[in-house]
């Protein structure tokens, strides 16, 4: 399965979508607080037929990459994103616990 990510940034918010060759698999929605150098992950959603395949984790990893590129700290308001990040190593540079 060929997966692609698209970042749909609009002002201080947006979402990252994950797609295969045919359709959207899920998305991570975020808000940027530029004055605080933070990226807030609002929620991570994966369509039911793709659940249990690690797609949500891939979205969180892409959010981490986006945050690192911009030198932002992530505040995960989404409980799923927070639980994934708590299990990850080497993200202290971007994770506000």
What residue spans do the PLM features occupy?
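STAS-typified acidic loop motif
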Residues: 15-21
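C-terminal structural segments of small proteins and small subunits
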Residues: 62-97
């Amino acid at each position: 399965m060929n997966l692609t990510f698209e970042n749909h940034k609009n002002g201080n918010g947006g979402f990252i979508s994950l797609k295969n060759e045919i359709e959207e698999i899920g998305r991570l929605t975020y808000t940027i607080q530029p004055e605080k150098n933070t990226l807030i992950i609002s929620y991570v959603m994966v369509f039911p037929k793709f659940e249990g395949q690690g797609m949500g984790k891939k979205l969180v990893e892409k959010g981490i990459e986006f945050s690192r590129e911009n030198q932002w700290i992530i505040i995960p308001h989404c409980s799923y994103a927070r639980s994934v990040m708590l299990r990850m190593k080497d993200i202290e540079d971007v994770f506000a616990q």
